[in-house]
From Swiss-Prot:
It is a peripheral membrane protein. The gene is Vps16B. The keyword NADP does not apply. This is Vacuolar protein sorting-associated protein 16B. Disruption phenotype: Viable and fertile, with no obvious morphological defects. Strongly susceptible to bacterial infection, displaying reduced survival after infection with E.coli and E.faecalis. The initial phagocytic uptake of bacteria by the hemocytes is not affected, however bacterial clearance by the phagosomes is severely reduced. Phagosomes fail to fuse with late endosomes/lysosomes, preventing the phagosomes from acquiring their characteristics and maturing into fully acidified phagolysosomes. No effect on endocytic trafficking and starvation-induced autophagy. InterPro entries: Spe-39, Vps16_C. It is found in: Late endosome membrane; Lysosome membrane; Early endosome; Cytoplasmic vesicle, Clathrin-coated vesicle. It comes from the Eukaryota. PANTHER family: DEFECTIVE SPERMATOGENESIS PROTEIN 39, SPERMATOGENESIS-DEFECTIVE PROTEIN 39 HOMOLOG.
Length: 447
């Protein structure tokens, strides 16, 4: 036997021909595969692969063209891309599994995962109301976000209005996300309609009010505000009194700006009530009388817009001081006591008097104006400190006289320019202080 193996003739027999690894002797197997139909006709099957004859099957005999397209679409959306080099048998198994999951039973978790990752997923497989609710609840439990909006839009498209609103009513978080989506997408009408549907009339009213104010011109804003006021007056679902007051005040302001062209020229587009009040102060020519019958008068406008007395006084003070109409300042702060109408007008300020003095000083008001306001301060110590701060010499003298600081007055007099108005004023204060002291001493002697 060993001799046979060693002989050259044994290995040269055709039955014992050895396999050659040389390129020139390479065996070409392609014709066999083509003849068997494996590559020529896409012949792949889950049948037994032991018999090559059984491989003569086409994928078209298993899947229709339409079904195959669905499988390929689903595969394109799936992260589980087929690895390179997979055998035809394994590829067919994967395609058939994906086709079954796509056409017959919706995969809840897989679909939710795709949506949460921001990928597209076919939702039409979720046919029943229960399946659609399950998908929405699954996404809500995992955080939701844009995926929840995608499903809500699908539900709105495939369900009737009653079913869709019922789902939102049972899921407040989904409702809030859908409302946010409507707002961000600019569907203001849908946003307001949904708020009203769920009984949130106060929010709906504010949204309508904001939309009316955002209108292009004064005439359009007035029209929308009038519709808003009329709608809630007859709707049977009123808003809180504060909102009604705001709506009516805004309507009156638009009517005033439309009617008075001179006022409109002083204002920018969509002014605030305080800006309109400032313009009313600019066009007002009579500050001595408070004309409540004239809509453009500052006092009437402030009342219509329910602007606080402090805000009205501060606005008027700034406008008159900047216009250097200082004679009108005292009229702004004059009030007739309501308990005694026949009594003369009294000075009344609704905010801190110190702020008024500092603001007038900042606007470079004359010292006589500063002295007028400083004279209304009752505390002489505070008056002295503030007068020194704003460099109002006469007010400093008044405060020192009120504190009976005769020595300090004498020192101040010596620092003032000779024969100046302030020096004469200081001398008179010293004389008055000395006279009062002499009178007091005489009274004590008589007693």
């Amino acid at each position: 036997m060993d001799l046979q193996l060693d002989s050259e003739s044994y290995w040269n027999r055709s039955s014992r021909a050895a396999f050659s690894f040389d390129d020139e002797d390479e065996v070409d197997l392609a014709p066999d595969l083509v003849s068997n139909g494996i590559l020529a006709d896409d012949t792949i099957s889950e049948a037994s692969f032991n018999n090559s004859v059984a491989l003569n099957l086409s994928i078209k005999s298993i899947l229709s063209e339409e079904a195959l397209k669905l499988v390929l679409q689903e595969q394109a959306l799936d992260d589980r891309v087929l690895p390179k080099g997979v055998s035809p048998e394994e590829e067919l198994k994967l395609l058939r599994r994906q086709l079954q999951s796509t056409l017959y039973s919706p995969n809840l978790e897989a679909t939710a995962q795709k949506l949460l990752q921001g990928k597209t997923a076919p939702l039409e497989m979720f046919k029943s109301l229960h399946e659609k609710q399950q998908l929405l609840d699954t996404l809500m439990a995992q955080g939701g976000g844009h995926a929840v909006i995608t499903v809500l839009l699908f539900l709105k498209r495939t369900l009737n209005t009653t079913q869709f609103h019922g789902i939102l009513r049972e899921r407040p978080k989904a409702l809030e996300q859908y409302l946010s989506y409507l707002k961000e997408s600019g569907d203001l009408a849908g946003h307001i309609e949904l708020l009203q549907l769920f009984g949130r009339h106060q929010e709906a009213a504010l949204k309508q009010f904001q939309a009316a104010l955002a209108s292009g011109d004064t005439s359009t804003r007035k029209k929308h505000l009038q519709l808003l006021v009329d709608a809630y007056a007859t709707a049977g679902v009123g808003v809180i009194p504060l909102y009604e007051q705001v709506f009516h005040a805004a309507l009156k302001m638009q009517q005033l700006m439309e009617k008075d062209s001179a006022l409109g020229k002083l204002l920018r587009d969509q002014p605030t009530p305080v800006e309109v009040l400032y313009a009313c102060c600019q066009v007002n020519s009579n500050w001595k009388e408070q004309d409540m019958l004239k809509p453009v008068s500052p006092q009437r406008f402030a009342a219509d817009q329910q602007i606080s007395p402090a805000q009205y006084e501060w606005t008027a003070l700034n406008e008159r001081a900047q216009a250097q109409a200082y004679a009108d300042l005292e009229c702004i702060f004059e009030r007739v006591p309501s308990w005694h109408p026949l009594k003369t007008k009294q000075f009344h300020i609704s905010f801190d008097l110190t702020l008024a003095v500092l603001r007038l000083y900042e606007l470079q008001a004359p010292s006589t104006v500063l002295q007028l306001f400083l004279s209304k301060m009752g505390n002489s110590v505070e008056k002295l400190a503030l007068a020194q701060r704003v460099k109002c010499i006469k007010a400093v003298i008044d405060a020192m006289a009120g504190l009976k600081q005769q020595q300090e007055l004498q020192q101040l007099k010596d620092t003032l320019p000779e024969r100046s108005e302030e020096q004469f004023y200081c001398e008179n204060a010293l004389k008055s202080l000395q006279s009062k002291r002499w009178t007091t001493d005489n009274i004590k002697l008589k007693l």
